[in-house]
């Protein structure tokens, strides 16, 4: 629905990271991803986060939101704040 004015964005994560607190806050289990070379974390500031393997998947998800796209810096900030909340 183009009527959704929320913002959406993505963040590339390379390799495998052991920060399970941060990844749990984003609503997925990083271990399941088997530490592939690149994971794209995608979503809005307030909705559950999604982990995809390609940026195209993320673009498809973000198409539903008409707000300006989050920068990677902003996405990183969301990640840190959510990790604190669930930590």
UniProtKB/Swiss-Prot annotation:
Domain BPTI/Kunitz inhibitor residues, every copy: 8-62
Entry's Gene Ontology molecular function annotations: serine-type endopeptidase inhibitor activity; toxin activity
Keywords: Cytoplasmic vesicle, Disulfide bond, Hemostasis impairing toxin, Platelet aggregation inhibiting toxin, Protease inhibitor, Secreted, Serine protease inhibitor, Toxin
Keyword Thylakoid: no
Major subcellular site: cytoplasm
A cellular-component GO term for this protein: extracellular region
Compartment(s): Cytoplasmic vesicle, Secretory vesicle; Secreted
Cross-referenced SUPFAM superfamilies: BPTI-like
Tissue specificity remark: Expressed in salivary glands.
PTM comment: The N-terminus is blocked.
Record motif Cell attachment site, residues: 17-19
InterPro entries associated with the record: Kunitz_BPTI_sf (IPR036880)
Disulfide bond sites: 8-62, 16-42, 35-58
Further remark: The monogrins comprise about 4% of the total salivary gland protein.
Function: Tick salivary platelet aggregation inhibitor that plays an important part in the anti-hemostatic strategy of ticks. Inhibits platelet aggregation induced by ADP (IC(50)~150 nM), collagen, and platelet activating factor (PAF). Acts by binding to platelet membrane glycoprotein IIb-IIIa (ITGA2B/ITGB3) in a metal ion dependent manner. Does not inhibit aggregation induced by ristocecin, an agonist that aggregates platelets independently from the glycoprotein IIb-IIIa (ITGA2B/ITGB3).
UniProt-recorded name of the protein: Monogrin 1
Source species taxonomy: Eukaryota, Metazoa, Ecdysozoa, Arthropoda, Chelicerata
